[in-house]
Each structure stands twice: as C-alpha cells, then as structure tokens.
Amino acid sequence: MTGPLATGRAGTGDDVVGVEVTIDGMLVIADRLHLVDFPVTLGIRPNIPQEDLREIVWDQVARDLTAQGVLDHNGQPHPAVAAMVDTLSRADRTLEGRWWRRDVGGVMVRFVVCRKGERHVIAVRDGDMLVLQLVAPRVGLAGMVTAVLGTAEPANVEPLTGIASELGECTNAAQLTRYGLTPTTARLYTEIVTNPKSWVEIVASERHPGGTTTHTKAAAGVLDSAHGRLVSLPRQVGGELYGSFLPGTEQNLQRALDSLLELLPSGSWLDRADATARG
C-alpha cells in the first residue's frame, strides 16, 4: 500500500495490525480456519489440484508462516491474523477494486476494503503477494481507498454528468460540450480519459443472513493522469444509470463511494442498527 497505513509482521504482541503473505500462505491460513470464500477480485482459490503435492507445499509454507509469527507452534494462526482473514472471508460489506497501472508497466493491482461488524480490513494483492491491514473505522472509506492508491492532486475540471451509456460513447471534446462544458474543460476531459496513468474500477457487495451476496451492477472509478485525479460516481435515477465525473478530492471520492453503496439493498456501508447507534 502506498498511503499512510504501514504494514507490519505478525508477532507475539497484541498490537499486530498487518501481515504480508503469499497466496499459498493465505490458503494455509484459511484451511486452518475452515474458510473457503473470499472476494472474487483477490483470486484466492486452490491452486494445486494434486492432494499429495499440495500437502508437501503446504507443509513448507506452514513452516515459513511459523517462522514469520503468523502461525504458532501448534499450527494455529495468530489471533489478530485470524480476525483479519475472517473479516476478509465473511465481510458484511466489501468494496472490490481493480487498479490498472500504466505508470508501472501495465500491471493490475487488486484490492478490497472489508467490514465485519466494527472491524475494517484492507487487503491488497500484487502478483502472488497479499497484504492485509487492520484499519480504524474513523479513517473513513475514502481514506482507506486512498491508503491503497496514494494521494494525488485533483484535476482542475468542472463536474460532468450524463446518462452513463451516452457518456461512454463520447470520444472527443466536441461531444462533451453538449453536456454544458466549456471547450477548454471538454478538451481537458478528453486528454485525461484518453491518456491516463492509471485507473481504478470499484464495485460493492453486501452479504445477507444465510450467506448470499449481492453485488452492484455499476462501479465507481478513480482515474489519475498528468492533469490530476478524477473520480466517477454512479447514480440510479428513474431506472436510468447516470454517471458523474468530479475533481478527485478525498471528499468527492467519499461521495462516489457513498453513491455506489446506495445501489446495494441496504443502501449503506453500515447496517441500519449500527448506523442508528452511531447517529
């Protein structure tokens, strides 16, 4: 993660807030905790079909995890690690992000922000490495996403709103001026969208009692360019999906995430009882 939330190694104390493991390491931890479901974006799934070979690999991985302090000498995960992995597997709400990075050779970084009860966890996958980070709720969703993406100057543009399908068909500045933009802003939008350094697509999901999950059909977005950061937010109006683009301030990123979460059955990041208690 590139933001202010530092990752740490698991140890013997009670202040463990982060851990870095391989995908094989995560599978071993999940097996110890009898967990099998994880956010699709992270791609955490069994990768060695041959049982005898898997046992050999997992034995070595378990030894490495024990040396790292992630597993104790009885083979059980550190309590803080177990809590983070449980949150990842059984989250009440999840934001799932795919981050395409032209600025570092076109790699895709996958990340999630998960909430289970009061506990919030960020997980980032880069290649075969996975970083889990426990984070305080007061950081806020925009702060948690920014912890992954890093900060950036917001693009100096006017807001742009339109029907999502129609905006998607715009390929030049002249078409964008139909939405009330000045020619200068329309050209700037065109330059940003056609030549991004990186872009992020974020969807949300909600876990229901009984274990079923609902995913949003639309996504929020973050786009970084030489001209600064843009955020995009989806909004359902009268059965029509609209998209809005705004300068990429943290406040506007929070607006985008709130708008995305409104598309879930609950309409929010918190359960109603939690929101009422906080209010």
From Swiss-Prot:
InterPro entries in the record: EspG
GO cellular component entries: cytoplasm
Top-level taxon: Bacteria
Subcellular localization(s) per the UniProt record: Cytoplasm
Disulfide bonds: none
Residues annotated as transmembrane: none
Alphabetical keyword list: Chaperone, Cytoplasm
Subunit structure: Interacts specifically with ESX-1-dependent PE/PPE proteins.
Recorded family membership: Belongs to the EspG family.
Role summary: Specific chaperone for cognate PE/PPE proteins. Plays an important role in preventing aggregation of PE/PPE dimers.
Protein name stated in the entry: ESX-1 secretion-associated protein EspG1
Species for this entry: Mycobacterium marinum (strain ATCC BAA-535 / M)
Gene this protein is translated from: espG1
